[in-house]
A protein has these predicted regions:
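Residue-level signal for inorganic ion chemistry
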Residues: 35, 72, 94, 116, ...
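A structural signal for short, well-ordered beta-strand elements
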Residues: 28, 42, 65, 98, ...
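ALDH superfamily catalytic-core signature
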Residues: 227, 235-376, 439
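Terminal low-complexity tails and localization/encapsulation signals of metabolic enzymes
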Residues: 1-41, 74-78, 126-152, 252, ...
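Structural signal for hydrophobic packing residues in well-ordered secondary-structure cores
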Residues: 60, 64, 80-87, 91, ...
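Conserved C-terminal structural/oligomerization subdomain of aldehyde/semialdehyde dehydrogenase
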Residues: 36-39, 225, 262, 316, ...
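Rossmann-like NAD(P) dinucleotide-binding subdomain of oxidoreductase/dehydrogenase enzymes
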Residues: 128-271, 323, 396
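Glycine-rich loop-to-alpha-helix module at the N-terminal edge of alpha/beta enzyme cores
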Residues: 36-126
């Protein structure tokens, strides 16, 4: 793959200006497909975060803060078109940066454009309401921006998460400070270039790359930030919330998951199979909403196991540019984590494994997709988030048992139910402790319009859909006495 960079990657965007971090320091960005260095990126720190917060506040008090919702929406709509115009360039950046197969990376770029379109159209559709009250009063509510919003974005889906987080915040009139992951920040920088081209006022979007322990920690604890959105690990999310809490700053957290799919004996197995497998191996399993637990009723357990095993045996892992179904993990460190979990499964039966492509660089972060069978629900592989292409098959006998197993982890992000029984569909939709429940599908095609978020250690707050616009705004009540 030729280097698709069309911009200088080692700069921060602060107040509409691209500049080196104050320290002058940079960090290497590594291609997980072969371990080579792509480029150097800025190593922003406390001073850069301070400057970006001031720039964002100035935007809130200036042209951006005075702009109408209609005008904001038009900018986002233009931005969506600019993203579509460069969708192949963005896909190449993401494939090189994250190791994501080109087809999946391109789908993420299209999703980013869709977020811009959706929130561009929704910007002037968020309304207050009038409230009947005492005689002589007129009471109504207003939706207003928080002000300066911080966005700490992970490495697994940079474009999609920027779209659902930054896109919604901009639609509501907030000025954003984006801290992309140090492992994958190229599409975040590209997005910022396109946002300027779309006409976004200076300071409305600021981008400070850097280490989480430096730039991320400074952003989380900054007293000038009015709201923080974080997507990432449970441990880091807890630290972000703790730091923000000292300034009484609200936080939206989208954290880990151990999402189950429940397959009943009356399920359409032909329809279910692609979802059962793909939900576990997409993006090499590095997805918060990955379905790593497949719960199967005993009457169809052997059939599901056989079909999934066949599908796994056909999986090949290779460099992003080869555009296979599975690419590398993000880093050798992540490979070590996933390999450690595979070792913990040495007491389990392996139903099937995928293969690593011949000629794949040994320096790439590759692991074989692995399907374990007959896994006890309390086993570490059935309980802990792995964040790799690993799935476990768990048999069950009754609906009640399936629900108990599904709800037995600390997480609650996504769940899926495969059954033709309408009553069972409704019972489980209510009974599953999960932010999203899908019936006879998984993920509903990505669903820009569908509110997304978790319960338990999967986090709190909602992004995507109109619900995100409420989260990135605050409600003001006005009570006017006129006699």
């Amino acid at each position: 793959m030729t280097n698709p960079l069309w911009f200088d990657p080692n700069l921060c965007l602060i107040g509409g200006e691209w500049k080196m971090p104050v320290s002058g320091q940079t960090l290497p960005l590594v291609n997980p497909s072969d371990g080579s260095e792509i480029c150097q990126i800025a190593r922003g720190g406390q001073t850069d975060i301070d400057a970006a917060v001031r720039a964002a506040r100035s935007a809130c008090d200036g042209d951006w803060g005075r702009m109408t919702a209609l005008e904001r929406g038009r900018i986002l709509t233009r931005l969506g078109q600019l993203v579509l115009d460069r969708v192949d360039d963005l896909a190449q950046l993401e494939a090189m940066d994250v190791g994501k197969p080109l087809t999946q990376a391109r789908a993420d770029a299209v999703a980013l454009a869709r977020y811009c379109e959706f929130y561009g159209g929704a910007a002037d559709k968020v309304m207050g309401e009038t409230i009947p009250y005492l005689d002589g009063y007129t009471v109504y509510t207003l939706r207003e921006p928080h002000g300066v919003t911080g966005h700490i974005v992970p490495w697994n889906y940079p474009m999609q998460i920027i779209g659902r987080s930054v896109g919604a915040a901009l639609a509501m009139g907030n000025a954003c400070l984006l801290k992309p992951a140090e492992e994958a920040c190229l599409t975040a920088l590209a997005f910022a270039h396109l946002a300027i081209q779309a006409g976004l006022p200076l300071g409305a979007l600021n981008v400070v790359p850097g280490l989480g322990a430096e730039a991320g920690a400074a952003l989380s604890a900054h007293p000038g930030v009015d709201h923080i959105s974080f997507t990432g690990s449970v441990a880091t999310g807890a630290l972000v919330q703790q730091a923000a809490g000292r300034n009484v700053v609200p936080v939206t957290l989208e954290l880990g998951g151990k999402s189950p799919q429940l397959v009943f004996e009356d399920a359409d197995l032909d329809a279910a199979l692609p979802y059962l497998v793909n939900a576990g191996i997409q993006n090499a399993g590095q997805t918060c909403s990955a379905s790593s637990r497949i719960l199967v009723q005993r009457g169809v357990y052997d059939a599901v196991k056989s079909r999934m095993a066949t599908a796994y045996q056909e999986l090949t892992v290779g460099p992003a540019v080869q555009d296979l179904r599975v690419g590398p993990l993000i880093s050798t460190r992540q490979k070590e984590i996933v390999t450690g979990f595979l070792h913990q499964g040495s007491d389990l039966a392996i139903a099937a494994e995928g293969q690593i492509a011949a000629g794949a660089p040994e320096s790439g972060a590759y692991v074989r997709p692995t399907l374990f069978s007959d896994v006890p629900p309390d086993h570490a592989l059935a309980r802990d988030e792995i964040f790799g292409p690993v799935q476990v098959l768990i048999p069950f006998d009754t609906e009640e048992q399936a629900l108990t197993i599904a709800n037995s982890t600390e997480y609650g992000l996504v769940a899926s139910v495969w059954t033709r029984d309408g009553g069972r569909q409704m019972r489980l939709a209510k009974g599953l402790r999960s932010g999203q429940v899908f019936i006879n599908n998984y993920g509903a095609g990505g669903g820009v319009e569908l509110p997304f978020g978790g319960v338990g250690k999967s986090g709190h707050g909602r992004e995507k859909g109109f619900e995100a616009l409420y989260g990135f705004s605050q409600l003001k009540t006005v009570a006017a006495y006129h006699g």
